[in-house]
Amino acid sequence: GDVGVIVSDHGQFEVKETIHLQGGKVGHVGVMTKGMFQTGETVTLKVCEKNRLSTAKNHSATHLLQKALRMVLGDHVEQAGSYVDAGRLRFDFTHFSAMTPEELQKVEDLVNEEIQAALPVVTEEMSLDEAKKSGAMALFGEKYGEKVRVVKMGDFSVELCGGTHVSNTEKISAFKILSEAGIAAGVRRIEALTGEGLMAYYQDTEKELHSAAKTAKTTPAELQKKIEAMLEEIK
């Protein structure tokens, strides 16, 4: 959810998390950083736009990921859970075995192709029956009202969703799968990065590679050969 600050003439509250409450209300979780609010006073909510955009990138990427998984693995794939924040995304899905490196690469390539295709992301409210007729993917076991929100990404992905998304897939920048593992019988989990989080990951990896090469007294390009030679000497 969103983070940011809530301010008034008498205090400031730092919002670290937002949660859904019963009755359609939203709870703001955080700490008072200045003063104290007074009952009945007017407050101003200031959303951290950078956090919202990064979270939206990861959320939109999960939609592309689900469609790519169904294309590569089959229509038996269904969402079994997900988590997104500004730093990363996690997607749980139904599948009967570990994915091969080739399958993971195909999925990653498909997602990146749709990012580069700059697909418009369009949201529309319609009846549940209309959404089903449009082919929109829905969460298994989820209860929906008569009116639902449909998120469409070009002709590639159509899902029922009430979350925040980018306006165009090109804003996701890039997508990288970090891991794929089983979390329960018949349920797999993929963790991945997009946007600024992915850039930071590549920068950290590059630093580690250069550091390892320096320790081995070689260049990053020759590091594997150097390690193989060292292992051969040990035998």
Descriptions of predicted regions:
Residues G1-K235:
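A glycine- and charged-residue-rich anion-binding loop/surface
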